[in-house]
């Protein structure tokens, strides 16, 4: 595949990098990333992946754009209020970079559809805002041997980790089981500073880009936390994969996917 003059100019700041070059940019254009949730995390992740020239990007979200989303979900604008989030996101991404194919899935992830959703993608980004969805995404990715980036944001704090099959603990190794319903507030209940999604969602995009390129160190076996009020990042080394883990352990007890409760809040 030969690049056009326009592509050489568009991706020139990538191509000049020793870690990327023409070969790496071709890897990005051939890459496929699925983003679950077109909200506070998914919005910046989608925009940076599209700008980077990741060739195929899937967006999963059943919701419509609400006015309260616009404080942080920068892929949508005022004129998009009432529009399906996946449609709004696709329009923004296509306007930014016509090289990118954007696949839209206007649905919630469930135990019945998630394996079909993730099967054709190289890397998954979890941009959801509830524990049932996060555990479902983890379990499906472990079963399908798909790498993924987990992240969460609330108030002035954020965190993320990356799972790559065979290279460290999964989300369930670390957090075991979903907390009781309503035990942990959502962003809607507790609030979130808008720029937090930009910080953490952009880091999720960075993890996906590094994975596709095969460069640098991923957040496998590590949890990165950010406190915006203190302006402090910390990287915590996680325990090794739990050989007793219910999904990725030596003798898994979870052999089929389940929905812990109705997943009604798909993104931040």
What are these regions (language model features)?
Residues 1-268:
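Adenine nucleotide-associated cytosolic modules
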């Amino acid at each position: 595949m030969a690049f056009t003059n326009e592509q050489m100019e568009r991706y020139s700041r990538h191509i000049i990098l020793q870690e990327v070059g023409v070969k790496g940019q071709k890897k990005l254009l051939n890459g496929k990333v699925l983003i679950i949730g077109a909200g506070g995390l998914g919005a910046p992740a989608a925009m940076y992946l599209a700008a980077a020239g990741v060739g195929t990007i899937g967006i999963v979200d059943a919701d419509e754009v609400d006015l309260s989303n616009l404080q942080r979900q920068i892929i949508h604008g005022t004129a998009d209020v009432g529009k399906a989030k996946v449609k709004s996101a696709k329009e923004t991404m296509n306007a930014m970079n016509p090289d990118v194919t954007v696949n839209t899935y206007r649905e919630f992830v469930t135990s019945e559809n998630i394996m079909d959703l993730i099967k054709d993608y190289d890397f998954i980004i979890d941009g959801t805002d509830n524990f049932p969805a996060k555990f479902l995404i983890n379990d499906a990715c472990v079963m399908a041997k798909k790498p993924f980036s987990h992240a969460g944001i609330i108030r002035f704090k954020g965190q993320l980790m990356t799972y790559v099959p065979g290279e460290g603990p999964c989300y369930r190794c670390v957090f075991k089981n979903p907390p009781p319903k309503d035990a942990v507030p959502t962003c809607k209940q507790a609030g979130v500073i808008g720029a937090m999604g930009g910080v953490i969602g952009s880091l999720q995009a960075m993890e996906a880009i590094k994975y596709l390129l095969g460069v640098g160190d991923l957040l496998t076996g590590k949890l990165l936390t950010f406190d915006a009020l203190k302006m402090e990042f910390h990287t915590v080394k996680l325990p090794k994969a739990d050989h007793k883990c219910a999904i990725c352990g030596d003798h898994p007890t979870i052999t089929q996917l389940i929905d812990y409760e109705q997943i009604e809040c798909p993104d931040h």
